[in-house]
Amino acid sequence: MRPIILASASPRRQELLKNLGLEFEVQVSDVDENLEENISSGQLVEKLAERKAAAVALIRTQGLVIGADTIVVLGDKPLGKPTNREEAVQMLSNLQGKSHEVFTGLAVIDASTGQRVVTHQVTEVNFKTLTKDQIERYVDTGEPMDKAGGYAVQGLASIFIDSIRGCYFSVVGLPISKLADALRMFGVEIV
């Protein structure tokens, strides 16, 4: 069987692949995640996921390389990962009591042929109304700092989520159903 390579350092993505029983290696892609193009959120996460997977596929001679990228979008404003405490508090203050969308791009590239599948998933997340004190206590845990939108749906922030419409796993960072479809196109069956 061809090796599967995850082009991500995300412990959450690694855990999701482990839960599927997939044997995989991790090789982090060191790519510029800034795109200056005026494109839709779906196109943005697809391009970034593909860029990450392609960078690793250039190094590897064989295997299936998985790249992913997640952004949170409130209204028409994309929210990346907060860079400091104040930014995390501001993001969560803006998200609380509202609905937002989470876009996760997925790219699977066959390193030996260059054949690729690139797609994305959109999920709607509804946050409860939060107090300033709740937000600050959550930010003080440190959990928001490496997460798009400043929260971890699978962590402590789960108590802030009123509802999710779409793919929970996509909010965590990897649209599992779409990944299974992409791997199947390359002859890899999960079950």
From Swiss-Prot:
Coiled-coil spans in chain: none
Cofactor section: a divalent metal cation
Subcellular location: Cytoplasm
Keyword Ribosomal protein set for record: no
Principal EC category: hydrolase
Keyword Cytoplasm among record annotations: yes
Gene Ontology annotations for the cellular component aspect, listed alphabetically: cytoplasm
Reaction it catalyzes: dTTP + H2O = dTMP + diphosphate + H(+); UTP + H2O = UMP + diphosphate + H(+)
Entry keywords, A to Z: Cytoplasm, Hydrolase, Nucleotide metabolism
Residue numbers annotated as active site: D69
Stored CDD domains: Maf (cd00555)
Disulfide bonds: none
Molecular function, one GO term: UTP diphosphatase activity
GO BP of this protein: nucleotide metabolic process
Site residues (Important for substrate specificity), renumbered to this chain: R12, T70, Q154
Catalytic activity, EC: 3.6.1.9
Classification via Pfam families: Maf
Protein purpose: Nucleoside triphosphate pyrophosphatase that hydrolyzes dTTP and UTP. May have a dual role in cell division arrest and in preventing the incorporation of modified nucleotides into cellular nucleic acids.
Family membership: Belongs to the Maf family. YhdE subfamily.
Protein name from the UniProt record: dTTP/UTP pyrophosphatase
Biological source species: Desulforamulus reducens (strain ATCC BAA-1160 / DSM 100696 / MI-1) (Desulfotomaculum reducens)
